[in-house]
Amino acid sequence: MPSSCVASLPDWIDRMTDTRNGEDSGKLLYCSFCGKSQHEVRKLIAGPSVFICDECVDLCNDIIREEVQEAQAESSAHKLPSPKEISGILDQYVIGQERAKKVLAVAVYNHYKRLNQRDKKGDEVELGKSNILLIGPTGSGKTLLAETLARLLNVPFTIADATTLTEAGYVGEDVENIIQKLLQKCDYDVEKAQMGIVYIDEIDKISRKSDNPSITRDVSGEGVQQALLKLIEGTVASVPPQGGRKHPQQEFLQVDTRNILFICGGAFSGLEKVIQNRSTKGGIGFGAEVRSKEEGKKVGESLREVEPDDLVKFGLIPEFVGRLPVLATLDELDEAALMQILTEPKNALTKQYAKLFEMESVDLEFRSDALKAVARKALERKTGARGLRSILEGVLLDTMYEIPSKKDVSKVVIDESVIEGTSQPLMIYENSEPQAKAAPDA
């Protein structure tokens, strides 16, 4: 409690005594903590023979909030989940990708274990940081894995798009803007930001345009890789406060990126061909090993054999590949996996739409043939899990438009014909038999 509050208590006691003893109801009331009168504050809250003003309530809230946050930070540091626990929680949100989950769980566990041990004295071995590179097709779950990890560990998290980044001095975003976004996520708390996670998406789009040096600068390709090197490895980045523009007279926030975990992700379309060319390349002469081209091999299977040299041939510079020592590849999602994604995760799309309909007191049912049809459409569009929502939005648009105006609908049923667009959703009305709209004439 502030000294001013303590010093004012005797005065307040005298005032309260005067008020009680002197039968004058017109006397002022005073805050029991700071001694301010009811006219000096916005609100005076009365208790059994005591009063507290709104300013003291705010002060108490701030003190309690700080103590709770410190206690939570300490407990989270001591309660770092094991790799198996991390993988188990990822299973609740991400279907399949078991190998990628295992790699991520171990890498993240070791990273934060390293942070928890860094302040201990007597440790002669300094542990290095292991940033992560996720390689997988569009819609396979790269971003979702990173988001779920950050939510699980309760650390600041931001997503950056590599395609918008350019070298400093050119039109576009500087790499320091990534750290600025991370600071915004934690209300510019530098200490919190320095233990956060940054996910850089579309990292394959900043590959070198060609192996041959050119007269023109590659400001959005190799130039960005060079700019990201120090940031990812660990440097002190100067960031303008509160998102302002940089100018010479400005004071900058200094953010140390050594303990920020960087996860880079990309589809790397065409990388499988680089891998296959390497694995099928044979020698010359009688002692050469004879290898046949592996026809019909899935992209995910090829990507599992990726090596750093393949990434360099794809267009990443060797120094950049070296800063991302942990490689995790994700498989293409098949029809069965897409059907699981629609129904099994905690935040599955069918559960989300069912919740929206429940708010209108209507049950929503997806039949199994409808789920298969949605999965088939997503496979045809080659958008992976990302395309599932757009398909369902298109199917349910008219129904969601009509339902709020109809008070007698109790249930909506979606089957395969609705997904294929040959019929409308089946609406079941209260106290009536199900009525389906007639199918169109053949």
Curated annotation (Swiss-Prot):
Can the keyword Chaperone be found in this entry's annotation?
A: yes
Q: List the disulfide bonds.
A: none
Ranges for domain ClpX-type ZB: 19-72
Its Gene Ontology cellular component terms are: HslUV protease complex
Q: Name one GO molecular function term.
A: ATP hydrolysis activity
Residues recorded as binding ATP, renumbered to this chain, are: P137, T138, G139, S140, G141, K142, T143, L144
The source's superkingdom equals Bacteria
Q: Which keywords are on file for this protein? A: ATP-binding, Chaperone, Metal-binding, Nucleotide-binding, Zinc
What InterPro entries does the record point to?
AAA+_ATPase (IPR003593), ATP-dep_Clp_protease_ClpX (IPR050052), ATPase_AAA_core (IPR003959), Clp_ATPase_C (IPR019489), Clp_protease_ATP-bd_su_ClpX (IPR004487), ClpX_bact (IPR046425), P-loop_NTPase (IPR027417), Znf_CppX_C4 (IPR010603)
One annotated GO biological process: proteolysis involved in protein catabolic process
Function per UniProt: ATP-dependent specificity component of the Clp protease. It directs the protease to specific substrates. Can perform chaperone functions in the absence of ClpP.
**Record-stated family:** Belongs to the ClpX chaperone family.
Q: How does it assemble?
A: Component of the ClpX-ClpP complex. Forms a hexameric ring that, in the presence of ATP, binds to fourteen ClpP subunits assembled into a disk-like structure with a central cavity, resembling the structure of eukaryotic proteasomes.
Against PANTHER family, the record matches this protein to: ATP-DEPENDENT CLP PROTEASE ATP-BINDING SUBUNIT CLPX-LIKE, MITOCHONDRIAL, ATP-DEPENDENT CLP PROTEASE ATP-BINDING SUBUNIT CLPX-LIKE, MITOCHONDRIAL-RELATED
What is the name of this protein?
Answer: ATP-dependent Clp protease ATP-binding subunit ClpX
- What is the organism field in this record? Pseudomonas putida (strain ATCC 47054 / DSM 6125 / CFBP 8728 / NCIMB 11950 / KT2440)
